[in-house]
Regions:
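Asp-box/BNR beta-propeller blade signature and adjacent active/binding-site loops
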Residues: 1-218
């Protein structure tokens, strides 16, 4: 609700914008600010699960008229809410990357291959890699993440930012896990074995049904 006497320069903050209209439910968007000022939005074609769709705004969010051209074929098989983050590097001359992630939870009685899928862009979202999957039923460690990753936070070591990012996700029993992303010398993604993040507070975590945790740097 727009407060009374709102200054004209701030009125746009209270405008409602329809990003997309399609048959059925659309929701759970996530967005990232592009270096040229554009806003790239991802959302599923369905309630939580469904083909990953995209829209781009070039006017500060007032309208969304573009979308990613020729998206990866694997995006059609997404099974969870997509999340997107910017990765900035300081330990190498690697340019920024964008990473989009979508989990593979168990939906009712539907079978799931588990794990989460990652797609990368090295050109500010113009082109993207096909999904690469981690912690699926074919791997030594299997998880069925819900909202992977609800948070992806760059880490520090000895007071300096390093090229590592801590991701969080949860499963149906409301256990929240952390896993750390890094890249090999040849640019391949590496994720550490997920570990329970709030094990010392499991009673609280379970009772409160803690989920979709966001980590904010203070």
């Amino acid at each position: 609700v727009e407060p009374k006497n709102t200054k004209e320069e701030f009125k746009y903050l209270y405008e409602n914008v329809t990003v997309e209209k399609k048959g059925g439910y659309l929701g759970h968007p996530d967005s990232v600010l592009l270096k040229d000022g554009g806003i790239l939005v991802f959302f599923p074609e369905g309630h939580g699960k469904g083909k990953t769709l995209s829209k781009i705004s070039r006017d500060g969010g007032r309208s969304y008229t573009e979308e990613i051209k020729n998206p990866p074929k694997s995006w059609e098989n997404s099974r969870e809410t997509p999340t997107v983050y910017r990765l900035e590097f300081s330990e190498s001359d690697t340019p920024d990357k964008l990473i989009m992630i979508s989990g593979n939870p168990i939906w009712g009685r539907e079978k799931s291959r588990g794990g989460f899928d990652c797609s990368l862009s090295s050109d500010e979202g113009k082109t993207w890699s096909e999904y690469e999957s981690f912690f699926t039923e074919k791997d030594e460690v299997t998880h069925y993440p819900i909202v992977a990753l609800s948070s992806l936070t760059r880490l520090r070591e000895n007071g300096k930012f390093v090229d590592k990012w801590m991701g969080l996700f949860h499963e149906r029993d409301f256990v929240n896990y952390k896993t750390v992303l890094s890249f090999s010398k040849d640019g391949k993604m590496m994720w550490t074995k997920p570990e329970p993040y709030f094990s010392a507070y499991r009673d609280i975590e379970k009772k409160s049904q803690m989920c979709e945790v966001e980590c904010v740097r203070s």
